[in-house]
UniProtKB/Swiss-Prot annotation:
The keyword Zinc does not apply. GO terms for biological process: carbohydrate metabolic process; N-acetylneuraminate catabolic process. Catalyzes the reversible aldol cleavage of N-acetylneuraminic acid (sialic acid; Neu5Ac) to form pyruvate and N-acetylmannosamine (ManNAc) via a Schiff base intermediate. It catalyses: aceneuramate = aldehydo-N-acetyl-D-mannosamine + pyruvate. One of its GO terms (cellular component) is cytosol. Aceneuramate binds at S48, S49, T167, G189, D191, E192, S208. Its EC number is 4.1.3.3. It holds the Pfam family DHDPS. This is N-acetylneuraminate lyase. It comes from Staphylococcus haemolyticus (strain JCSC1435). The gene is nanA. Belongs to the DapA family. NanA subfamily.
Length: 293
């Protein structure tokens, strides 16, 4: 299973209308774009880039369903089902598993200061209820939850905890995880550090900017794995120029505007996120043209 899940994934964007409802046709277009145009291996569905923590349980199910119906069985699909409500996480996990998602992923429980034993049991309860494989979603900058190498060991002792989506800048810990658990899947979550992560031995990556810049990510990943580090860095420099500009304009509305430039209905971000600021339009047009986005 771990080998099947290796590769590059779009952290899938989700288009909303002005009332905060999912635009299904736009979602289908975004999913197809990631696979057919950006040439990615799979989709990570209902993660941070899908504005997951701003939407209802029924919307999450709707997104899981539409994406699966759109791409079928030929694309790797990972369902992010993490929720502070364990019952909801289990319900979503069962639903995604029934749809045929290849693995589940769940962000570490956050906001409340949960103990590691509580966090570990949360994952094991989801696995027990769904009988699907689990990829830990470690994003300490947003959750405040730091998992130590010893704690990763306790999680990885469960045969169905197959890996981690590692969205953290601690490359010492990443190296330690890679050395200690050579058979576990590690997917990098920082688009701007793909060269460094690949050198550190990750099996793939999941990125929000891969929705529009996946082809460069593929070049970086392949070159770094071939040991062509200087060449990989040159493309990473361009990628980071793109990322820096996109972040300055607001990541989700800006990525959706880039999709719109391709004739894709990128929709709006979910409130309270603001829509794209039109004062950035000329700069965005320049970015799209310069980097052929």
């Amino acid at each position: 299973m771990e080998d099947k899940l290796k590769g590059l994934y779009a952290a899938l964007l989700v288009p909303f209308d002005e009332h905060g409802q999912v635009k299904e046709e736009g979602l289908k277009q975004i999913a197809k774009n990631a696979i057919e145009t950006e040439k990615l291996d799979g989709l990570y569905v209902n993660g941070s880039s899908g504005e997951n923590f701003l939407i209802s349980k029924e919307q999450k199910k709707q997104i899981f369903r539409v994406v699966k119906e759109t791409v079928g069985d030929d694309v790797n699909l990972i369902a992010q089902i993490g929720s502070l409500d364990l019952n909801e996480a289990i319900e979503l996990g069962k639903y995604a598993t029934e749809l045929g998602y290849d693995a589940l992923s769940a962000v570490t429980p956050f906001y409340y200061p949960f103990s590691f034993e509580e966090i570990k049991q949360y994952y094991f309860d989801i696995i027990e209820a769904t009988q699907n494989n689990m990829i830990i979603y470690a994003i300490p900058d947003l959750t405040g939850v730091n998992i130590s190498i010893e704690q990763f060991g306790e999680l990885f002792n469960h045969e169905k905890v197959v890996g981690v989506k590692y969205t953290a800048p601690n490359f010492f810990l990443l190296e330690r995880i890679r050395k200690a658990f050579p058979n576990k899947l590690i997917l990098s979550g920082f688009d701007e550090m793909l060269v460094q992560a690949t050198i550190s031995g990750v099996d793939g990556a999941i990125g929000s900017t891969y929705n529009v810049n996946g082809r460069r990510a593929r070049q970086i990943f392949d070159l770094a794995r071939e040991g062509k580090i200087a060449e990989a860095y040159q493309i990473q420099h361009d990628t980071n120029d793109i990322i820096e500009t996109v972040l300055s304009m607001g990541i989700y509305p800006t990525l959706k505007e880039i999709l719109k430039s391709r004739g894709i209905d990128g929709g709006l971000p979910k409130r309270p996120f603001r829509p794209f600021d039109e004062s950035h339009r000329d700069a965005l047009d320049t970015l799209i043209k310069k980097y052929d986005l």
